[in-house]
Design a protein with these regions (language model features):
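Positively charged N-terminal leader segments that act as targeting/secretion signals
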Residues: 374-383, 399-400
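Nuclease catalytic cores that cleave nucleic-acid phosphodiester bonds
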Residues: 59, 128-341, 345, 385-388
């Protein structure tokens, strides 16, 4: 059913979709402050793999309806990838960029355990038929464009983008590819990712505070993943809690994920107390330990066999490792077509001129510009590739062991 707001909305007052999408870009001065601080006592890598959560980047446009050019979505997403790739290149760090999109986030592997998972935002997308259809029409164009954008790839799936990224990251590591990873998102679910991967940084995109233009986006690492998640859902400053940061899935099972429509079984203080008690007795937080310790500490909750089943299902729905296991049983997990690329700068320029004249792809940032002083002309060359598409395909198709 189409949302009545579409009919009632005053298009003259609507915000153009491209304005919403470009607001998802974190400015270079903010990025510079964040990463200068992060690398002040660490060696700066020569390569980084960047994963961008396109689902979360597109989600805000489903509250708006003004469309000036249907191709602006593709242009903005392409420029989002170039924006971050260019930032790191200026710092002497080259990169792969993986644009990850899941229009039915959680439907394949999570709603079987928790039917309500992400229901609110799924309905928001479906009810805005105009934007929903326009996004779907842009997907083939984005896929085609990325075939010509060197080292920028677009992968579509049906699971959480965090699961897609986790799959690729672990396959890289299993093949001894040790480049650090950056995951850019505004997903609460994604806080698990840095808790699981030692050298992964999550760049959490925040909306500016009301009445300000201040960008409060921040970095999340293995050392502060759980602390940062608690601060995010409680809308408070980050505190240090003496709990294993990698047990975030256990905490989420108990306290819920607000932006994924999973309500709390325990408040955050009770959830922390349960995890601390488990930490004193066990090596890991499992559904059994969560249930048993919860019963012991909070008998007034009246937990029963139904509660146990609920905790088991919530854990399977949430836990990143379990979701990775589920994902790897699906055909989409071994798809490598998205890695196929064509070295044809002239074709890319023609595509840009044909489809994106009003909102062009920033090719000058994508390509290096080498000045040949003897001939007085600019020579456009593609960046250095540290792995071929065939090698990448072999890695991402490889086994999980």
């Amino acid at each position: 059913m189409t949302n009545n707001r579409v009919k009632e909305y005053d298009y003259l007052e609507a915000v153009p979709i491209e304005h919403i999408l470009y607001a998802q870009f974190i400015k270079y001065d903010k990025l510079n402050r964040l990463f200068t601080e992060y690398y002040k006592d660490k060696p700066v890598p020569k390569w980084i793999n960047i994963y961008i959560d396109v689902y979360q980047a597109l989600l805000p446009i489903f509250s708006f309806y003004k469309v000036t050019n249907p191709y602006n979505i593709t242009a903005c997403i392409a420029n989002l990838a170039i924006h971050y790739k260019s930032f790191f290149r200026k710092a002497g760090i080259d990169s792969f960029v993986f644009l990850l999109y899941s229009p039915t986030t959680g439907a394949a592997t999570q709603q079987r355990f928790c039917p309500e998972y992400n229901g609110k935002y799924t309905m928001r997308m479906i009810n805005n038929k105009e934007v929903y259809d326009m996004v779907n029409q842009n997907i083939p164009l984005i896929q085609m464009l990325c075939q010509y954008m060197n080292n920028i790839f677009f992968k579509m799936g049906t699971v959480e983008t965090s699961v897609m990224a986790y799959d690729m990251i672990t396959k890289f590591k299993n093949r001894q590819i040790t480049a650090p990873s950056l995951f850019i998102t505004s997903s609460q679910y994604a806080f698990q990712l840095p808790s699981k991967v030692k050298d992964l940084i999550m760049l959490y995109k925040k909306k500016p505070l009301p009445g300000t233009s201040d960008d409060t986006s921040y970095l999340v690492t293995q050392q502060n993943a759980l602390d940062s998640y608690i601060a995010e859902i409680k809308k408070q400053h980050i505190e240090k809690f003496e709990v294993n940061q990698s047990w975030l899935s256990g905490f989420m099972t108990l306290s819920g994920i607000p932006k994924r429509n999973l309500k709390s079984l325990f408040n955050y203080k009770q959830s922390l107390k349960i995890l601390k008690s488990i930490d004193e007795q066990f090596d890991q937080a499992t559904p059994d330990s969560l249930f048993n310790v919860g019963c012991k500490l909070y008998p007034n909750k009246g937990l029963d066999s139904h509660s146990y089943d609920e905790i088991v299902n919530r854990f399977r729905c949430i836990d990143l490792d379990y979701q990775l296991y589920m994902y790897r049983t699906m055909p989409e997990a071994i798809d490598t077509v998205f890695l196929e690329q064509v070295n044809d700068p002239e074709a890319l320029k023609n595509i840009n001129d044909q489809y994106f004249s009003q909102n062009p792809i920033l090719l000058e940032k994508l390509w290096y510009q080498n000045i040949n002083k003897n001939e007085g002309r600019v020579v456009m060359t593609l960046p250095f590739i540290f792995l071929s598409s065939n090698q990448l395909s072999h890695i991402t198709h490889g086994s999980s062991s």
